[in-house]
From Swiss-Prot:
Keywords from the named record: ATP-binding, Ligase, Nucleotide-binding, Protein biosynthesis
EC number: 6.3.5.-
Record GO terms (molecular function): asparaginyl-tRNA synthase (glutamine-hydrolyzing) activity; ATP binding; glutaminyl-tRNA synthase (glutamine-hydrolyzing) activity
Enzyme class at the top of the EC tree: ligase
Subunit structure: Heterotrimer of A, B and C subunits.
GO biological process: glutaminyl-tRNAGln biosynthesis via transamidation; regulation of translational fidelity; translation
Classification of source organism: Bacteria, Pseudomonadati, Pseudomonadota, Betaproteobacteria, Burkholderiales
Protein name: Aspartyl/glutamyl-tRNA(Asn/Gln) amidotransferase subunit C
C-alpha cells in the first residue's frame, strides 16, 4: 500500500498539521517505509506459531503474575460528573468537532 502526496496532504489536513513541501516529502517517505515493513511482515508464514504474550517467553519460562479481576475502587461517577459542563444519562456531553 503506497501512499501518494495527495494522501499525505489529506492526512495532514485531518490531523490539523501544516507541513511544508519538504516535510510532506519526508513524511511520504517515512509512511511508505512503514507500510513496506508491514507488507514484509504480512508475507511471513506464521502457520503453527503460537502467539507470544511477551518476547521473553520465546527464550525462557515466564510466570504470569495474574491477579483476580476484582473491583478495588468505589463508583464515583456521579461525584466526578458534578464538575462537568454537560452530562446526560451518565455520559459526558462534548461539542461536535467532526466537520
Amino acid at each position: 500500500m503506497a501512499l501518494t502526496p495527495t494522501d499525505v496532504s489529506r492526512i495532514a489536513l485531518l490531523a490539523r498539521l501544516e507541513l511544508s513541501e519538504a516535510e510532506q516529502s519526508a513524511m511520504l517517505s517515512q509512511l511508505n517505509g512503514f507500510f513496506d515493513i508491514v507488507e514484509r511482515m504480512r508475507a511471513v508464514d506464521t502457520t503453527g506459531v503460537a502467539p507470544l504474550y511477551t518476547p521473553l517467553s520465546a527464550v525462557q519460562e515466564v510466570a504470569l503474575r495474574l491477579r483476580e479481576d476484582a473491583v478495588t475502587e468505589v463508583d464515583q461517577r456521579q461525584a466526578n460528573q458534578l464538575s462537568a459542563p454537560a452530562v446526560e444519562a451518565g455520559l459526558y456531553l462534548v461539542p461536535k468537532v467532526i466537520e
